[in-house]
């Protein structure tokens, strides 16, 4: 009886770990695509529009002094 209980408990724990670690439950991070600063190599005049053009929901300039274009 004890071995059967341990087996069931192990199965429940493993099932929980598989569900929790599945990719669809992960939070998707923003993606850095370039710079929002004049004169930079990857300058994007409109970060939000460029992100939408690439298939993201939108974008924003962020990080220290808002120098990076992040898509979400």
From Swiss-Prot:
Disulfide bonds join 36-61, 47-69, 51-71. One of its GO terms (cellular component) is extracellular space. It is found in: Secreted. GO terms for biological process: defense response to fungus; innate immune response; killing of cells of another organism. Coiled coil: none annotated. Hemolymph and midgut. Induction: By bacterial infection. Induced by A.niger alpha-1,3-glucan. InterPro entries: Defensin_invertebrate/fungal (IPR001542), Scorpion_toxin-like (IPR003614), Scorpion_toxin-like_sf (IPR036574). CDD domains: Knot1 (cd00107). Belongs to the invertebrate defensin family. Type 2 subfamily. This is Defensin. The lineage of its organism: Eukaryota, Metazoa, Ecdysozoa, Arthropoda, Hexapoda.
């Amino acid at each position: 009886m004890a071995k059967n209980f341990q087996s069931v408990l192990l199965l429940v724990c493993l099932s929980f770990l598989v569900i929790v670690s599945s990719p669809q439950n992960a939070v998707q991070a923003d993606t850095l695509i370039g710079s929002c600063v004049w004169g930079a190599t990857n300058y994007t005049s409109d970060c939000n529009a460029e992100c939408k053009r690439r298939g993201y929901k939108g974008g924003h300039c962020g990080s220290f002094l808002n120098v990076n274009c992040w898509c979400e």
